[in-house]
Curated annotation (Swiss-Prot):
Matching InterPro entries: Smr_dom, Smr_dom_sf, SmrB-like
PROSITE patterns: SMR (PS50828)
Subunit structure, as described in the record: Associates with collided ribosomes, but not with correctly translating polysomes.
Annotated ranges, domain Smr: 92-167
SMART domains linked to this entry: SMR
GO-annotated biological processes: rescue of stalled ribosome
Family: Belongs to the SmrB family.
GO MF assignments: RNA endonuclease activity; rRNA binding
Class of this enzyme: hydrolase
Function description: Acts as a ribosome collision sensor. Detects stalled/collided disomes (pairs of ribosomes where the leading ribosome is stalled and a second ribosome has collided with it) and endonucleolytically cleaves mRNA at the 5' boundary of the stalled ribosome. Stalled/collided disomes form a new interface (primarily via the 30S subunits) that binds SmrB. Cleaved mRNA becomes available for tmRNA ligation, leading to ribosomal subunit dissociation and rescue of stalled ribosomes.
Gene: smrB
Protein name: Ribosome rescue factor SmrB
Record keyword Magnesium present: no
Highest taxon in the source lineage: Bacteria
């Protein structure tokens, strides 16, 4: 607690001083929430960039089962994916969506896999008119983060689903060392 004598001494010491006028400019910063929303929107736009409707990849289709393996990956990974050795941690249901909405959802799924460090995801295409079922693999093979895809085994959706492996930063390190 401040003594009466100390307070009087302080007041005499600062007698005649004036309050400093604030003349510095403080820049306005964008709130963190808006920055993260903007960054996520940009990432989603960047991801959608990879999904061209005109691209026709050479996909392996044996017995109506669609398969894809990136060139730098061990072929045994594709066999494991087809057997169901990988358990999907994220599921995306595209039933009833338009092509544009499905493309946006695919971009969001890949971003979510990267953010949550999910290696395997399942995409439910359904049977329907088969337009999405045929287009989804064509879009996925264009994305650099997609390692492999395979028609899902029965326990993960069978003919109506696709399992996809998404590259994670640490998985690349494990392969290199």
């Amino acid at each position: 607690m401040i003594e009466h004598d100390d307070l009087a001494l302080f007041r005499t010491a600062i007698k005649g001083t004036k309050k400093i006028k604030q003349d510095t400019f403080v820049p306005k910063t964008m709130p963190r929430k808006k920055v993260s929303e903007w960054r996520e929107t940009q990432q989603q736009k960047d991801t959608e960039f990879f999904f061209s409707d005109e691209y026709e990849p050479l996909l392996k289709e044996e017995n109506e089962k669609v398969k894809y393996l990136r060139a730098d990956i061990d072929p045994y990974i594709l066999k494991q994916l087809g057997r169901g050795d990988f358990q999907p941690d994220l599921f995306l249901d595209l039933h009833g969506l338009t092509r544009q909405k499905a493309k946006t959802e695919l971009a969001a799924l890949i971003l979510a896999c990267e953010r949550e460090q999910v290696y395997c995801a399942s995409i439910m295409t359904g049977y329907g008119t088969r337009t999405l079922k045929e287009q989804i693999p064509r879009w996925l093979v264009q994305h650099p983060k997609v390692i492999a895809l395979h028609q899902a085994p029965k326990q993960w959706g069978g003919d109506a689903a696709i399992l996809v492996l998404i590259e994670q930063p640490e998985s690349l390190e494990k392969r290199l060392f």
